[in-house]
Amino acid sequence: MNKNSFEAELLHTPFDKEDAYHSLSMPVYNTAAYEFDTAEAMEEAFCGRTADHAYSRITNPTVQYFEKRIQTITGALSVTALNSGMAAISNIFFTLAQAGANIVTSAHLFGNTYSFFKSTLAAFGVEVRFCDLTNPEAVRAQVDENTCAIFLEVITNPQLEVADLKVLSGIAHQMGAPLIADTTVVPFHIFHANEFGVDIEIVSSTKYISGGATSLGGLILDYGTFDWSNSKKLRSMADQFGASTFTAKLRKEIHRNLGAYMTPQVAYMQTLGIETMEVRYARQAATCLQLAQRLQTLPQVEAVNYTGLESNPFYQLSTKQFGAYPGAMLTFDLASREACFRFMNRLQLIRRATNLFDNKTLAIHPASTIYGSFTEEQRQSMDVSPKTIRLSVGLESAEDLLTDISQALV
């Protein structure tokens, strides 16, 4: 069979015809449990010796179909679907980290990720080392034999900083650690994480995949590229499971125990979202670039940050890693916090909301919301400015959005 294009793979997969009734859409198996013909069959399923479903906190046919769809279009060795992006992050690091281990990352993180590292993991004896990931020497100074991972957001939110992934991958692998990346800002067809040395990818499927802001979800993609015999915590499993060692630990223990598996209803909705993701993204990203270019001309706007602008300091690296349209999120600075609030309050078309990559364009003031519980000192260390507005660009026309922005800036 000929290799299908990415666009075709979003709509058609080799296992589409597995349903006994030939449904064009994957049925929703809205069940908690499954019946077995014999006690022996039940034992085999619960011990993981067969592929039969035992309980929907562990696996479910609808969720499994969604996972296979993602696996097909990304080439990942395995995909685990959970109920949020934060569930994906916590499941990964409870799988990898142990007391005495450290994680090397940037302070430029989503607020809850930062809090998870700084507070939750610290309580388990895991050290988090913050450094400038755009500076290889600063990273090398932080990694050591106890580093269990280097973690980053491929385009930070809301700072829009970009680090060289191949360089970070080389540093991580040299120290026997995987490179883990949150790639939520750029979808699969724009950025192929494994080609840049990413071993484990995190995606908040709430965003581009869902599209309509109807459901929460998070994905863990394991590309099977890391040698887990180098991992202090997982090396004892490496001989048995090889490239699948991380996934084996995750699926057999952590994900079962934390109970954050995706629900079948969400998997169904997000499977539908996958089918239109490429079409939606093309419009969103093109409009985002137009807005960034036009915002630069407005006198009330002090600065515009979008890595697709040629004037952006990360433009060359961003283009190399993500192409000409690096996501549908931009930020811009106004004169003050008060000016930001006046702008937000005057918006008529653009919605005031916290989500990203909805079909609708959304505006937020990150310093007072996502980072509102942080101290001023913490916000400064994370480069979160009180003068910054973040826009997540939707499917409206650029002209309609510019009209709303212009009237709100008056």
Language-model-detected regions and their locations in the chain:
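Short hydrophobic/aromatic beta-strand micro-patches
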Residues: L221, T331-D333, S392-G394
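PLP-dependent enzyme catalytic core of the Aspartate aminotransferase-like
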Residues: G100, K118-S119, E127, E145, ...
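Short conserved active-site loop signatures built around small residues
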Residues: M1-Y29, I220
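Short loop segments at secondary-structure junctions
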Residues: A33, Y223-F226, L334-E338
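Conserved small-domain helix->loop->beta segment predominantly found in fold-type I
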Residues: L258-A260, T276, Y281-R283, C288-K360, ...
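Conserved PLP-enzyme active-site core in the AAT-like
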Residues: L10-D16, S78-P299
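Conserved N-terminal alpha-helix of the aminotransferase class I/II PLP-enzyme fold
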Residues: A33, T38-S90, N112-S119
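Short, solvent-exposed beta-strand edge segments and adjacent coil->beta transition regions
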Residues: T50, A267, I274, Y325-M329, ...
